[in-house]
Design a protein with these regions (language model features):
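Gly/Thr-rich phosphate-binding beta-strand-loop-beta motif of the actin/hexokinase/Hsp70
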Residues: 1-19, 106, 138
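Short glycine-rich, Thr/Ser-proximal phosphate-binding strand/loop in the N-terminal lobe
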Residues: 10-36
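Short, basic/hydrophobic alpha-helical segments
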Residues: 35-52
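Phosphate-backbone recognition surface of nucleic-acid-processing proteins
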Residues: 38, 225, 231-232, 236-311, ...
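Short glycine-rich phosphate-binding loop at a beta-alpha junction
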Residues: 50-61, 223
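Short alpha-helix plus adjacent loop in nuclease-associated cores
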Residues: 77-118, 130, 169-173, 269-277, ...
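Glycine-rich, often acidic, oxyanion-interacting loops/wings at catalytic, nucleic-acid
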Residues: 131-222, 349
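Acidic, carboxylate-rich catalytic segments that either coordinate divalent cations
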Residues: 296-353
Length: 353
């Protein structure tokens, strides 16, 4: 088995074949980032029928090449840049760095079965991740535009506009206003442009929510049955988690989301502190779910929270414990969703009968 490490860049990719038995380079090739050059790469790689590809940052600069190789039936591993840096520093020339060394380092990580993660074809979760990212960008742009509009209204009229400003209320506020100076006329024109921008953002956010709902129905997830999980949070959870089976346990997923406490132990002292690591967007989503459930008296989350309070824990500790509990619960539901989707039609019929 030969491992082909790839150091991807925007315009070029460098591939280095490594024999794991001896950890030696057996060949290297540099190509341009184009389909024609991809084909040249695969022809070069056919010299090793039993091969695995190890692409550094396959979710970033190596994304297109990784998907192209998957379409050909190749086995592709994603190698974090931090892992290649460690290998390069410890075993491949210290501070020396070039594309060939980086590619060989990626192959070495894959051969050692360290931080490598197998890349799979894209699924509905990837579509949800794209829509969620777009929604976040739209929301930020809308908030920024509303803030600009508030600034103009403060300059146009005493007291400015109400805090909860919408395109409709902003239009109504301008309707009876008569600018008296040249700068005020410009402010009114700019305000009308910003109102049009807000209206457009609202329409785009509405369309985005509709697309998310369709994809969630297609996915068949049961996350929306959990108190506090609506379409937007469900899309974020699925999109940023990807395949839940890549986490070996609920504890591993909790660590990934940053909801697992960090142990600080020395001699006879053992304490746990809040984790500042993990996927912070997933952490934020789980926090939102926890806070919603705490405010719902009949929810399972509120029962769990009250149990911790009854044990003498502080509200902050109880909230963190609920987040950790929710992370495990969410992971199990996503695992069940994945297993259900993997069943064949005959298995579904057999279970129903």
């Amino acid at each position: 088995m030969i491992v082909i490490g790839v150091d991807p860049h925007k315009s070029t990719h460098t591939a280095t074949a490594v024999d794991p038995a001896t950890n030696s380079d057996v060949g290297s090739l540099r190509i341009e980032a184009s389909l024609a050059e991809y084909r040249r790469l695969i022809v070069w790689a056919k010299a090793w029928p039993e091969r695995t590809w190890a692409i550094e940052n396959a979710d970033g600069l190596g994304h297109h090449l990784a998907l192209w190789l998957l379409a050909l039936g190749e086995v592709v591993l994603d190698i974090p840049t931090t892992a290649t840096a460690r290998v390069r520093e410890l075993s491949r020339g210290g501070r020396r760095k070039n594309d060939r060394i980086d590619a060989a380092a990626a192959a070495s990580v894959a051969a050692l079965q360290g931080d490598a993660r197998q890349v799979h074809p894209e699924t509905t979760s990837d579509s949800l991740a794209l829509l969620d990212e777009r929604r976040v960008n739209l929301s930020h742009s809308r908030t920024r535009t509303v803030n600009q509009l508030h600034a103009l209204f403060r300059e146009l009229m005493a007291g400015g506009a109400p805090t909860s400003l919408t395109s409709t209320s902003a239009t109504a506020a301008l309707r009876g206003f008569r600018p008296r100076t040249g700068p005020d006329r410009v402010r009114v024109e700019l305000a009308k442009e910003l109102i049009a921008d807000i209206r457009r953002f609202d329409e785009q956010l509405k369309a985005n929510a509709a697309k998310i709902a369709v994809l969630l129905d297609e996915h068949g997830t049961r996350l929306r049955e959990i108190d506090g999980v609506g379409p937007v949070l469900a899309a974020r959870l699925l999109g940023r988690t990807g395949s839940p089976s890549r986490f070996v346990s609920a504890a591993a997923y909790a660590n990934y989301t940053g909801t697992a406490p960090v142990q600080i132990a020395s001699a006879d002292s053992c304490q746990h502190r809040l984790s500042r690591y993990g996927d912070r967007q997933l952490n934020s989503a789980i926090y939102t779910i926890a806070m919603i459930q705490i405010r719902m008296p009949a929810s399972a989350g509120r029962v769990y929270y009250d149990k911790k309070i009854a044990e003498g824990k502080s509200p902050r500790y109880a909230t963190r414990a609920l987040k950790r509990h929710l992370a495990s619960h969410l992971w199990r539901i996503m695992i069940a969703d994945e297993n259900r989707a993997a069943r064949t039609p005959s298995e579904v019929v057999a279970d129903a009968s």
